[in-house]
UniProtKB/Swiss-Prot annotation:
It is an enzyme of class 2 (transferase). Catalyzes the formation of 6,7-dimethyl-8-ribityllumazine by condensation of 5-amino-6-(D-ribitylamino)uracil with 3,4-dihydroxy-2-butanone 4-phosphate. This is the penultimate step in the biosynthesis of riboflavin. This is 6,7-dimethyl-8-ribityllumazine synthase. Pathway: Cofactor biosynthesis; riboflavin biosynthesis; riboflavin from 2-hydroxy-3-oxobutyl phosphate and 5-amino-6-(D-ribitylamino)uracil: step 1/2. InterPro entries: LS, LS/RS, LS/RS_sf. The active site is at residue 88. Its EC number is 2.5.1.78. GO terms for molecular function: 6,7-dimethyl-8-ribityllumazine synthase activity. (2S)-2-hydroxy-3-oxobutyl phosphate binds at residues 85-86, 127.
Length: 154
């Protein structure tokens, strides 16, 4: 049996990050975690491009534009959607997750889902660097692993 695994090494990779400005007190921490994860694994800062969008709903379009440019080996999508009193939360979560998934499948470029979807602000804070780790950092490691896995498969 031949096992193919993505390694936590990189060789000249370039990563695009799309981050939502809405709930910026959370998303800026996710972005910090993503950049930290990439730099700690030897991705030079000049190989990391960051695009800010108004909110999570706008993430898939810019992720798709980045993917179509073919400049990036992976794209990391970061946002924070926190449930409120209306059904808006459900619509945004559904469309953002579908949109991000479609970008990855259509482009065949790893697109990491770092949009935290939580019931309350406390859960979002936990996922942005406290009790539950930092989902941005997790996405950075996942991006490096997926880049190497995709390269191995060809």
């Amino acid at each position: 049996m031949n096992v193919i695994e993505g390694k936590m090494t990189q060789d000249g990779i370039k990563v695009g990050i799309v981050v939502a400005r809405f709930n910026e007190f959370i998303t800026s921490k996710l972005l910090g975690g993503a950049k930290d994860g990439l730099v700690r694994h030897d991705v030079p800062e000049e190989n990391i491009d960051v695009a800010w969008v108004p909110g999570a709903f706008e993430i898939p379009l810019i992720a798709k534009k980045m993917a179509k440019s073919r400049k990036y080996d992976a794209i990391i999508c970061l946002g924070a959607v926190i449930r409120g009193a209306t059904s808006h939360y459900d619509y945004v979560c559904n469309e953002v997750s579908k949109g991000i998934a479609s970008v990855s499948l259509e482009s065949e470029i790893p697109v990491m889902f770092g949009v935290v979807t939580t019931e309350n602000i406390e859960q979002a804070i936990e996922r942005a660097g406290t009790k539950a780790g930092n989902k941005g950092y997790d996405c950075a490691l996942g991006a490096i692993e997926m880049i190497n896995l995709v390269r191995q498969i060809g």
